[in-house]
Design a protein with these regions (language model features):
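Patatin-like phospholipase
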Residues: 1-36, 44-282
Length: 282
């Protein structure tokens, strides 16, 4: 059983989009896909088999003022850096149609990670095949300070990366004996507390366990990477890691930079395809 784990990283995740399209071209379809934040948001087009859709999303939509920007964050009806209705409703349902029928026919399982605001713990949810407003994907992408809390079944959730940034262990628990893990940070990256971390901790002080998860994220991330790389060295997982992200940051919208990062991911996967197939056949 093949698992595919997709780290988040907002615009940096365009690297993963190139890899996913290369996998689709070579008919490498995972039985279990799990994504965090943008990893899940882009991963759904892998599950629907729509090669090139993520590239169009990145280069034609993400850089527009309609898609994201500070003005959306201060809009009391939106309260998010991204235009929520446009990104999760208008784009997939009108301007860049998502193939719901193909997704319904996907034989694998697709999960997203979210963090429960009440207790700071990770929850792993199947991405519905009939939610045309993508509420779960909004939740897994809900970065602290940049998104409102997203309600699902009466509970409030935010970005899955806070509690489980690289959920490959969940794929193993699901029964995957072969695992592809796609990272979006360069090899050797060590996470440190971001400048906004202290502000986020204060902002969410009414939810102390959630604030604690934010405070300890860097330490847990680095431990996870170290353990993952041990498994890679033992040949138990196949890991894609970019050597560079070409200066693409979290909210990058420059279509030239995004295309360059996508192409890099695509070419990386094609270059590694023989080794990947050997791993899958072991």
């Amino acid at each position: 059983m093949l698992g595919l784990t997709l780290e988040g990283g907002a615009s940096r995740t365009v690297y993963s989009c190139g890899i996913m399209d290369a996998l689709l071209e070579d008919k490498i379809i995972a039985d279990y896909v799990i994504g965090v934040s943008a990893g899940a948001a882009f991963g759904v087009s892998y599950c629907s088999g729509q090669i090139g859709r993520n590239l169009r999303l990145a280069t034609e939509f993400m850089g527009t003022k309609k898609y994201m920007g500070a003005r959306h964050l201060i809009d009391p009806k939106n309260r998010c850096y991204y235009n929520l209705d446009y990104a999760y409703n208008v784009v997939p349902n009108v301007e860049l149609p998502f193939d719901y029928e193909a997704y319904r026919n996907f034989k694998g399982r697709f999960c997203a990670v979210v963090t429960n605001v009440k207790n700071g713990k990770a929850e792993y949810m199947d991405v519905p095949k009939d939610d045309t407003h993508w509420n779960l994907l909004r939740a897994t992408c809900a970065l602290p300070l940049l998104f409102p809390e997203i309600e699902i079944n009466g509970e409030k959730y935010m970005d899955g990366g806070i509690s489980d940034s690289i959920p490959y262990l969940q794929a193993i628990k699901a029964g995957c004996d072969k695992n592809i893990v796609v990272l979006t940070r360069p090899k050797g990256y060590v996470k440190t507390q971001e400048p906004a971390t202290k502000l986020a901790i204060k902002y969410y002080h009414k939810h102390p366990e959630f604030a604690e998860a934010i405070a300890t994220r860097a330490e847990r991330y680095n431990k996870c990477i170290a353990e993952l790389m041990e498994l890679k060295a033992e040949g138990k997982v196949f890991v894609f890691t970019p050597k560079t992200t070409f200066g693409v940051g979290r909210t990058e919208g420059d279509p030239v930079k995004l295309r360059k990062l996508y192409d890099y991911g695509y070419n990386h996967a094609k270059w590694a395809m023989d080794d990947l197939k050997k791993y899958l056949c072991k």
